[in-house]
Each structure stands twice: as C-alpha cells, then as structure tokens.
Amino acid sequence: MSEPLVLETSRLRLVPIATADAEEWWGTIWSDLDVARYLPPQGILPVEAVRERIRIAMEHWATHGFGIWMLRETRSGSLVGHCGLLANESSDPELVYALCRQVWGRGLATEAAAAVLAYAFDTHNLAQVSAYVFPRNTASSRVLRKLDFHAEGQVRRFQAHLDHFVLRHE
C-alpha cells in the first residue's frame, strides 16, 4: 500500500494517525466524557487503550489504504479531533469522527467528513459508506444528513441500538 495521504480543507489539515498522537488524542477526545460517551465503548479510555487503538489504526492503514486522520486546525495546528473510514467485515466501510467540545457547532465535522468521503470515493471506488450514531447524538445525525447520508433504520452494535446511515456514491 502507498503511504497514507495528508488531506487539507479550508480550515483543517487531516494527518494520518501516528504513535506520537496518543497523549494529545487522549486529552482531546478520550478523556472528555461529553465526547467519549458517543464513542464505543461509551466512556473515558485510559491512555494505554488509546495507544492500542492507534496501533490498530496504523495496521488498518497498511492493510486497507485508508483509516483515521487526526484533525488539526490549519491556523493553530491544534488537534481538534479525528475523522476517517474503517473497513467493516460485515458491511460497507464506516465513516467515523469525533471533535472536541471546544469546536462543536462550527461545521468542522462536516468539512472533515466531506474531505474523507471525496478521497474514499475517488481513490478507492467505493459504492457506499455507512455510519452509525447513538440516537441521542442529534448533532452527529445532522452532520450525516448535510453530507446526504440517508437513515436506514437501527442496528444493534457495541451493546447498543444505533441509527444506521448510508451514503451511496453516484
């Protein structure tokens, strides 16, 4: 596989996940219950678990040619979240994202996801992408609808009922 690609938008630089991101990613996303409650396993993770997620994510990049990008604000360089695609053995690749509370409501999730989806559809010729959202996470559902995802009902994953959304590439 080729080296992971850096993507850029008007306000973000999307950099493939790396081992050096562990503490900063933990501090930005995984140590904040208001953010982590919407991510499996629905709670704060210890930094060691975040390091393991990074190891798995880097293997995913090597295997599939896509994965998780760290989201850095272009102006400040600050890490504000992550966004990416994960291969799913039982269905379509899955769009995943999370942003720190300090940037909620600014459209950055939509901006990052649009860049990831454009890359995925253009480079990997995917037919469709899925996303799964906890029903109480209405902000995330709005992001997906802005990106033209369509609700497909609910599924049971991660010991919870999640709303399932699909975006078909045309």
Regions found by a protein language model. Give the residues of each.
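Short amphipathic alpha-helix in the helical subdomain of ABC transporter nucleotide-binding domains
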Residues: P46-V50
